[in-house]
Swiss-Prot record:
Transmembrane segments annotated in the record for this chain: 4-24
Origin superkingdom: Viruses
Compartments it resides in: Membrane
Annotated protein name in UniProt: Uncharacterized protein 325L
Gene Ontology cellular-component terms listed: membrane
Keywords of the record: Membrane, Transmembrane, Transmembrane helix
The organism's taxonomic lineage, starting at the top: Viruses, Varidnaviria, Bamfordvirae, Nucleocytoviricota, Megaviricetes
Keyword Transmembrane (UniProt): yes
Membrane topology, record value: Single-pass membrane protein
Amino acid sequence: MFTQIALILSLIILIFFIYKFAMFKPHVVLTPLEYFNSRKRKILEYLDNYKVKLNVSIPPLTCTDLDKNYDIEEFEVMKQTNPEKFKKYISCGYVHNVYLLTAFEEWINNSLTHSDVSFENFQYLCIRPPADISTVDFKNFKSYIKSCIQTNKTNVTYY
């Protein structure tokens, strides 16, 4: 009797371990460039789900590698401490991409109405990149976007 219970428990434990082993999926580690492209794809999918139209063009990303993922605020430090790397990231489109994606992300997170009119107003009033992207105050960019959303009432749908 005792051996039968032990055998059944052993069989259940064996089945459990086989199931766990079969379902194991290793954690995928993305390179900084893959992570950025994944983030970009997710943000653009959000915008697509809201059925809004992009009136600004996202420049092609020609970087072949990134040493890490940068938040927009980090560009302000990079501009001062490593201008060559900053210029490299401008020339390959990375800074412009982060600029626009950060702006889109702020609209997604802070706009009360995710309508086409709201997004159109937001694009026109808040996110026109300057001719020289290096002149942007990256440190305060997110707060500028939030303020622009509130000030210009881009979260209101007009009928």
